[in-house]
């Protein structure tokens, strides 16, 4: 019995040290090519008058981030966490509840990160990469899927038809960085 307790204590200690792999501090282990600084949070304002895509700027592509909170009520639930998004290591905006926003990017390959902004839920991160062409639009949907013991943040590419439907139902989000 004493041996089991010793092994349990050693195992917990080893797991606690895994955040500092390969001699790097934990912050440098964060997926720097996609996610932004961990301490950046946003306040989100919803604009219910904006419904729909906008044409891309000349020489740029647009990447849309649409969050579907799964409630089917077309708005932000009071307790629903904010979802923030990064492209190539810089946060570009956030959604709260069912909402969307777009960001202009240069043509080429990009790395996308989405993360829940919450102190109540454990860190939830999803990653993707995409290659974009000037004049084109690309769409990602996030959903927080919960069950009895599991919470998953899902990030998926969707087509323009699905995005068009979601634009018609959801307000546009404008995120302001918290100081």
Give the predicted meaning of each segment.
Residues 1-7:
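Sec-dependent signal peptide recognition
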Residues 7-16:
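Hydrophobic h-region of N-terminal signal peptides that target proteins for export
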Residues 17-179:
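Short loop/turn and low-complexity linker motifs enriched in small/turn-promoting residues
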């Amino acid at each position: 019995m004493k041996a089991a307790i010793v092994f349990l204590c050693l195992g917990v200690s080893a797991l606690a040290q895994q955040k500092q792999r390969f001699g790097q501090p934990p912050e440098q282990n964060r997926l720097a090519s996609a996610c932004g600084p961990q301490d950046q949070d946003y306040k989100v304002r919803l604009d219910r008058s904006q419904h729909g895509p906008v044409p891309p700027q000349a020489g740029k592509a647009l990447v849309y981030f649409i969050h579907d909170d799964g409630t089917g009520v077309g708005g932000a639930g009071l307790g629903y966490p904010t979802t923030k998004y990064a492209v190539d290591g810089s946060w570009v905006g956030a959604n709260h509840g069912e909402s969307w926003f777009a960001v202009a990017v240069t043509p080429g390959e990009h790395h996308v990160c989405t993360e829940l902004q919450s102190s109540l839920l454990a860190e939830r991160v999803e990653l993707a990469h995409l290659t974009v062409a000037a004049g084109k639009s690309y769409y990602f949907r996030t959903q927080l899927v919960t069950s009895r013991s599991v919470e998953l943040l899902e990030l998926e590419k969707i087509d323009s038809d699905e995005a068009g439907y979601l634009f018609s139902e959801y307000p546009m989000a404008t995120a302001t960085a918290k100081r």
